[in-house]
Amino acid sequence: MSINDLVLKVNDVLTGSVLIIALVGIGLLFTFKLGFIQIRGFKDGWNRTFGGLFSKKGDAGKDGMSSFQALATAIAAQVGTGNIAGAATAIAVGGPGAIFWMWISAFLGMSTIFAEAVMAQKFKQVGDDGTVTGGPVYYIRGAFKGTFGKVLAAIFAVLIIFALGFMGNAVQSNSIAASWNTAFGIPKIAMGIFVAVVSLFVFTGGMKRIAKVTELIVPIMAAFYIVGSLIVIFANVTAIPAAFHDIIVGAFKPAAVAGGAMGATLKLAVQKGVARGLFSNEAGMGSTPHAHAVAKVNHPVEQGFVAMIGVFIDTFVILNLTALVIITTGSRTTGLTGAQLSQYAFSTLYGKFGEIFIAICMLFFAFSTIIGWYFFGEANIRYLFGAKAVKIYSIIVCICVALGSLQEVELVWNMADCFNSMMVIPNAIALVALSGLVKKTHDDYYNNFLPNQKKGK
């Protein structure tokens, strides 16, 4: 049995039952417990997000981030290869219906990430020198006192370091290298080394440099991809109704619209949709709370609103555009997968520039994700080993980025799925245990903080 076959068997267990039950269960729990906060709080989140866009130099504290910088760092991590290569892989393997399950995962995930951000704010740590840090390890320990809390937090910390810092960033590098090799013929290892060197420069600047880079890159890369995608979609506007038909019908009857995904089944559509949805928007995975924890806000719920917008932008905007480009152009029946499928879809209108367009987007999307994931992993390195281990960690991450460019794409994606799925378990256990505190904090915002704020107190 090959390593890939072994990883696939583990993934079948995790994504076939454990992951779906955990993500859907937690999403439903917070959706109902918080009264559909993803709908009620959407306007607040939207206003805070785009208000922050024009005042992103807001107070970040001595060693923290502004609310916008925290969101930019979170989106930098969320909007990565999962939105281009991951969405394409989900469609190629699970059929168009996989996109529907990504929608469901994202809708429920908006309430989950709200809870994650609120708890990250609630349990964040501020050092004597003003340095702010936070993340699931702190609210896991807050949820469970004694040895169990310490052990569960340590397990999560180890998982996220491997899942994102090492394996996840290898995936990002792999997709950059593959797309640039296709578009420009550049050797994969050359791109891997280039990305690793630039990444190291950003890493050595700490939180402040990471925040400055992400708040600059994220709005530009998102706008560039949105415009480029809309042009292709509107060029195939007559195919849009059929595309949504295939997504909806394919969610429940994959064989009816399988096309290129001849082996598509309902189980496969759900598995690929939820797994790729998790890898893309990261709700419930426990990654983005590291960014939301260090934001300077007046109440934890305020950052919860902002966090929800990250999932919305990632899945309902960016990922949807990729899906519609692939489906409306008829590219899903080509037998291609990953970044190559997305490149082919864009090339149906742009020609050779389509490959170049995806290569450029992939570089910025994946590079920004590498930065975000490094930051998340670093927080856990500090938690486990202290600041002295950060330098070694940054070097190992860069080695993974360089070597990840050469790995077999299927194995890299499958291993990333495996580690991402395992991260959900300790995070989910803590969120369920803290659900009462999430509700209490939510109620405090609406019953006390907001009325007092309106009175000018």
Question: What is each of the regions a protein language model found here?
Answer:
Residues 115-123, 128, 228-246, 254, ...:
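Extracellular/periplasmic helix-exit of transmembrane alpha-helices
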Residues 108-116, 193-207, 218-238, 271, ...:
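Selective recognition of specific alpha-helical transmembrane segments in multi-pass small-molecule
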Residues 22-29, 34-46, 156, 173-180, ...:
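Membrane-interface loop-to-helix entry segments
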Residues 30-31, 105-130, 137, 141-174, ...:
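Helix-loop-helix module between adjacent transmembrane segments
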Residues 1-81, 92-98, 109, 402, ...:
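N-terminal alpha-helical transmembrane segments of multi-pass membrane transport
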Residues 36-65, 89-96, 111-147, 332-349, ...:
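Flexible loop linkers connecting adjacent transmembrane helices
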